[in-house]
């Protein structure tokens, strides 16, 4: 996944920002063709989506010290977009109560069919899987604090709101 901060459509497509991107491309160690070849070598699926999400500062902070990522892409059932967003917020309350990182929520503006995606940043696979180390009592309390009846309700509730979803894990490519 590649994230390109835009700030706004007006600013992103302003002559100054277009000139900055052109200069950056000209100064790059890779030609546009070489960049696309490298991108293709690491990509199995490509789709463009424009989203609203956390601030650039929040994204940068989430990426600090991490190299393992969990991405969940969701298409809501008709009329369930708002409830899906709320469910994702509830899951964040649950995660934070367990001492885990909050996932970033990005909401579709244009492009791909997805209504939203979440991106969680972790140090490594063990960090991502660490919720299994939490006691059942603590998980139950965290679920209730987040608005769920139990931790076992979280996944099934999500599925009442979505037509489909994809999730995957990835590592940083540098």
Report each predicted region and the residues it spans.
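Short S/T/G/P-rich N-terminal loop/turn motif that feeds into the first structured element of a domain
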Residues: 1-174
């Amino acid at each position: 996944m590649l994230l390109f901060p835009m700030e706004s459509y007006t600013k992103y497509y302003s002559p100054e920002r277009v000139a900055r991107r052109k200069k950056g491309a000209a100064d790059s160690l890779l030609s546009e063709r070489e960049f696309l070849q490298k991108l293709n070598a690491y990509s199995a699926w490509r789709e463009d989506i424009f989203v609203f999400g956390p601030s650039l500062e929040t994204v940068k902070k989430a990426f600090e010290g991490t190299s393992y990522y969990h991405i969940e892409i969701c298409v809501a059932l008709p009329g369930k977009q708002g409830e899906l967003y709320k469910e994702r917020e509830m899951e964040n309350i649950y995660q934070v109560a367990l001492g885990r990182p909050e996932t970033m929520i990005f909401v579709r503006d244009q492009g791909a069919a997805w209504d939203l995606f979440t991106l969680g940043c972790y140090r490594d696979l063990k960090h991502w899987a660490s919720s299994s180390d939490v006691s059942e009592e603590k998980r139950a309390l965290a679920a209730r604090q987040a608005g769920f009846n139990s931790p076992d309700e979280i996944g099934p509730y999500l599925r009442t709101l979505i037509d489909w979803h994809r999730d995957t894990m990835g590592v940083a490519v540098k």
